[in-house]
Regions:
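Internal helical hairpin/lid segments
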Residues: 215-287
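Sequence-structural signature of the catalytic-core scaffold of metal-dependent phosphohydrolases
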Residues: 2-33, 49-55, 80, 84, ...
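A glycine-biased, small/acidic residue-tolerant capping/turn segment at secondary-structure junctions
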Residues: 286-295
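Alpha-helical phosphate/pyrophosphate-handling elements in metalloenzyme active cores
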Residues: 67-99
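Alpha-helical scaffolds flanking conserved acidic
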Residues: 42, 93-106, 153-159, 172-176, ...
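Conserved small/polar residues in nucleotide/adenosyl-binding loops
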Residues: 324-326
Length: 326
């Protein structure tokens, strides 16, 4: 018995009957020889962590475009926070922590530069539309490794694709990431908005904070504990009705008072103009694309519009800004 087999046996001995065992994965699109040391989901976690797309998240906007100060969230810090929350829940519920972490680390790989305003404009101008969750899957299936993709397991790709609000992950680990994403962005975006002096903690609606908690720390603890208590030894990941209603209410309040506020929207038109300018330039100058993107058209028959959107979506905010005067 090698190290991987020992770890797989350990999983079977202590994990919940509802956990996704590494030894029972539905596998990869392209079969590979098993690793002697690492179970399959751990290999996926490592591949995502070492990918170019993951590294670029450090310079991609979460809510505030090019914020002044070192303590605002980026896509990378958000991703790490989602991973921490999700792993805490998965470990306590005796589910597969490696699968959970892999999904969490990969869930936002497809986000565009300039936050949701970048996604909005790419969805308008790309011939086949654009969503960050489908782009995240496209990155791991096609774009990474010069067009070869990361060849991740089915369960990780399913969790990445279905982390959105309307998604239905096929594993409990994917369901954990889906809820952890909401918990992270609501609480940490509140923290960033308070730092930006958009409002104070005391101005948050009491009807929601009396249930969720009156600080970021309280809310995180209460929401995580609620999920654990309502999901322990059950075949579903759920919150109590009161906690979920309060979370959804605060989420709506955040959309009205933060995401649609004048401060984060002040640069939105500028960001959309920059994305449009880049799209029009590369549609007319395909020869300026990196060779790996050109080869997607030559070798795989990908549409020019699709490949141009791939290239722009992969840019960091900083890199996109540096190209505006090309």
């Amino acid at each position: 018995m090698n190290i991987r087999e020992s770890l797989e046996a350990l999983e079977e001995s202590y994990m919940s009957p509802y956990a996704s065992l590494s030894s029972r994965t539905r596998g990869r699109d392209k079969p590979e020889q098993l690793c002697d040391m690492r179970p399959e989901y751990q290999r996926d976690r490592d591949r995502i962590l070492h990918s170019k797309a993951f590294r670029r998240l450090k310079h991609k906007t979460q809510v505030f475009l090019a914020p002044e100060g070192d303590h605002y969230r980026t896509r990378l810090t958000h991703t790490l926070e989602v991973s921490q929350i999700a792993r805490t829940i998965a470990k306590t519920l005796r589910l597969n922590e490696s699968l959970t972490e892999a999904i969490a680390l990969g869930h936002d790989l497809g986000h565009t530069p300039f936050g949701h305003s970048g996604e909005y404009i790419l969805n308008k101008i790309c011939e086949d539309g654009f969503t960050h969750y489908e782009q995240s899957v496209r990155i791991v299936e096609v774009l990474e490794k010069d067009g070869r993709g990361l060849n991740l397991t089915w369960e990780v790709r399913d969790g990445i694709r279905n982390h959105r609000t309307s998604g239905h992950p096929s594993t409990l680990e994917g369901a954990i990431v889906r809820l952890s994403d909401k918990i992270a962005y609501i609480n940490h975006d509140i923290d960033d908005a308070i730092r930006a002096r958009m409002f104070t903690e005391h101005e948050l609606p009491r009807v929601y904070t009396d249930v969720l908690g009156h600080s970021v720390r309280e809310r995180l603890n209460n929401m995580i504990h609620d999920i654990i208590l309502n999901s322990m030894d059950k075949p579903a990941i759920t919150m109590s009705e009161g906690m979920e209603e309060a979370m959804q209410g605060l989420r709506k309040w955040m959309f009205d008072n933060v995401y649609k506020n004048d401060i984060p929207k002040a640069e939105e038109g500028k960001a959309q103009n920059m994305i449009t300018q880049l799209y029009e330039y590369y549609m007319g100058h395909v020869d300026k694309l990196p060779v790996e993107y050109v080869l997607l058209m030559v070798n795989k028959g990908e549409k020019k519009s699709r490949v141009v959107c791939d290239y722009i979506a992969g840019m960091s905010d900083i890199y996109a800004l540096s190209l505006i005067h090309i």
